[in-house]
Amino acid sequence: MKINGNEIRPGNVIEHEGGLWAAVKVQHVKPGKGGAFAQVELKNLVDGRKLNERFRSAETVERVRLEQKDYQYLYENDGMLTFMDNETYEQIELSREWVGDRAAFLQDGMKVTVESHEGKALGISLPDQVVLEITETEPTVKGQTATSSYKPALLENGVRVMVPPFITTGERIVVDTNEVTYLRRAD
């Protein structure tokens, strides 16, 4: 779908210079002399490169709609993560490296959303929060309540997060997968 250069919004995916780019930041500029334009920070969806580009309001760009499909995480084998389509039971494999650091939060049976374009996976969305058990943390020091100090804790998936002093080893906590931070105790 063609859109004008001044209609680009953050989050839009456009086809530009032969690749797929996501608009990260958009700033509309109206200089005193000349026509208005949109200063757009783009991120390549395939290799992660960034690019700053100006689009005049008269220019048109191709806006791309990504296909979103729900998958269920099954297992990891030799650095490849296997997901299953819940409707067709078809399985796809994505490399752990491609998924990135957030792969540590994948749990058996977890539902994820894979974004793709023309059959090629471009992005993966995990749930915003996961419940994990603390396997190791320092004991609380009595009298250390004057300041709100956090202490490091090792989670069952090997990730370290900072937790409040009242959290102990063996407790289950809710972790934000985007920020990799402690949110609260699990119910």
UniProtKB/Swiss-Prot annotation:
Q: Provide one Gene Ontology cellular component.
A: cytoplasm
Where does this one sit in the cell?
Answer: Cytoplasm
* Example GO molecular function: translation elongation factor activity
Q: Where is it chiefly localized?
A: cytoplasm
Q: Name one GO biological process term.
A: peptide biosynthetic process
InterPro entries according to UniProt: Elong-fact-P_C (IPR015365), NA-bd_OB-fold (IPR012340), Rib_uL2_dom2 (IPR014722), Transl_elong_fac_P/YeiP (IPR020599), Transl_elong_KOW-like (IPR013185), Transl_elong_P/YeiP_cen (IPR001059), Transl_elong_P/YeiP_CS (IPR013852), Transl_elongation_fac_P (IPR011768)
**Keywords of this entry:** Cytoplasm, Elongation factor, Protein biosynthesis
The pathway it acts in is: Protein biosynthesis; polypeptide chain elongation
Q: Which family does it belong to?
A: Belongs to the elongation factor P family.
> Which PANTHER family is this protein grouped with?
ELONGATION FACTOR P (PTHR30053), TRANSLATION ELONGATION FACTOR KOW-LIKE DOMAIN-CONTAINING PROTEIN (PTHR30053:SF14)
> What's this protein's function?
Involved in peptide bond synthesis. Stimulates efficient translation and peptide-bond synthesis on native or reconstituted 70S ribosomes in vitro. Probably functions indirectly by altering the affinity of the ribosome for aminoacyl-tRNA, thus increasing their reactivity as acceptors for peptidyl transferase.
Protein name according to UniProt: Elongation factor P
